[in-house]
Amino acid sequence: MITPPPLVILGFGYTGRWLYRLAHEQSGRILASSRQPERHLTEVPPTDRIRFDVTDPTSWPTLPREADLIWTFPAIPLDQVQEFAKQHCHAHRRLVVLGSTSAYDRHEQPTMDLPPWIDETSPINADLPRVQGEEYLRAHHGAIILRVAGIYGPHRNPVDWIRRGRVGPTNKFVNLIHVEDLARLCLQALRQGQAGTSYNISDGQPRRWVEICHEVSARWGVVSPRQTLAEEAGKRIRNHKALTQLQYTLRHPDFYQALRSIEGLPA
């Protein structure tokens, strides 16, 4: 059996921590990076910690040359992203970059009650700095771009968002993905994704906040104190390409079952 190359997780936030844990299910060395590893990587063995800051070229050589990369933070600023990639994103290195479905935000879009479905052929907003960095990495260095919907999971619970009034019963569509599914899709993209392509990462079930608020209220009696305000229509993200090409079955396809599990709420 061929041992896979080392994997470096660039960034150790919410998604990075899940990635680090799940990546240990595969063989091979897993390393994690942070701008302040002694502060943010305490759960990682010291031998697997890397100081990396895309804005600090002196930190770039710390990455093992043979390692693949999963890049979890915004690919900005563009000039530093370009310089790093020219020096360190060689042809044999697999690179997965986490983007956002906000790449599809376009100010000139008319407001409509039922927005059209968005897939990977839909236009993106190249004026966004993050999108510029992602597209440079995709077009020039074969990066696999994952355009990620809203992330939820343990300690990032939409029921709490409603309870605290962060969201209310608006007609805006929201697209979500459980953090475990996101992390597993990152690893699957690293193994099977096509270099230089992009994938939309969501559960494929866009919902209006008013529908979510109604269901959460009916099931668990949680009501948002936020007043309903006129908002944009939101987006409806299609995930077919990711699930089929990456050959992945969602672990959390039932949103409300996932919410119940996250907080131990009654069914």
Where in the sequence are the language-model features?
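C-terminal amphipathic/interface module of NAD(P)-dependent oxidoreductases
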Residues: 230-267
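Conserved Rossmann-fold NAD(P)-dependent oxidoreductase catalytic core, especially the SDR/UDP-sugar
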Residues: 85-125
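NAD(P)H-binding glycine-rich loop region in Rossmannoid oxidoreductase-like domains
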Residues: 46-87
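Glycine/proline-rich active-site loop of Rossmann-fold NAD(P)-dependent oxidoreductases
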Residues: 128-131, 140, 151-164, 180, ...
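Active-site Tyr-X1-5-Lys
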Residues: 121-145
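Substrate-positioning beta->alpha
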Residues: 145, 167-190
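N-terminal Rossmann-fold NAD(P) dinucleotide-binding loop
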Residues: 16-17
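Mid/C-terminal beta-alpha module of Rossmann-like enzyme folds, strongest
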Residues: 183-188, 192-239
